[in-house]
Amino acid sequence: MNAYPWLEIPRTVRFSDTDAAGVMHFQHLLGWCHQAWEDSLEQFGIPVGAVFPGGRSDQPSVALPIVHCHADFRAPMYVGDAAVIHLLPKRIDPGCFEVVSEISLNTQKVASGCLQHLAIDAVTRQRCSLPEPIERWIEASTLGQIQPL
């Protein structure tokens, strides 16, 4: 078990995640990555309404659009498979970060995905610093790791 439980998200492959061949469809992997990030924020204590627009609370002043993503499959995932998504957040610069998601079945790494986000002012759409709750989440998630200068 990880010392940071908000970075390990369990997920089961559902029938709706699979294609006609009975394996996980490629498009669902990035959706899993984003949903795991949302779950992680909530487990850490950050309400998703404070980060994502469209909720019932005040709208966030900073938007975090995805500016780059990629995914890799290493082995098939079938309906009913119980996976664990391990999140590896990393600050790229004061206004940009990425979250790598490593998906495992038991101890076998079967897939990975990466979502890179850029912070922009929600009104002006100009680049800005990451919001404080995201800074805290990244900082807490990388404690004890060597970070590049």
Curated annotation (Swiss-Prot):
* Known pathway: Cofactor biosynthesis; phylloquinone biosynthesis; Quinol/quinone metabolism; 1,4-dihydroxy-2-naphthoate biosynthesis; 1,4-dihydroxy-2-naphthoate from chorismate: step 7/7
Q: Which HAMAP family match?
A: DHNA_CoA_hydrolase
Q: Name one GO molecular function term.
A: 1,4-dihydroxy-2-naphthoyl-CoA thioesterase activity
Q: What does this protein do?
A: Catalyzes the hydrolysis of 1,4-dihydroxy-2-naphthoyl-CoA (DHNA-CoA) to 1,4-dihydroxy-2-naphthoate (DHNA), a reaction involved in phylloquinone (vitamin K1) biosynthesis.
Which sites are catalytic? 19
E.C. number, please? 3.1.2.28
The EC class name is hydrolase
Query: Know the name of this protein?
Result: 1,4-dihydroxy-2-naphthoyl-CoA hydrolase
SUPFAM superfamilies according to UniProt = Thioesterase/thiol ester dehydrase-isomerase (SSF54637)
Ordered alphabetically, the record's keywords are: Hydrolase
Q: Which organism is it from?
A: Synechococcus sp. (strain CC9902)
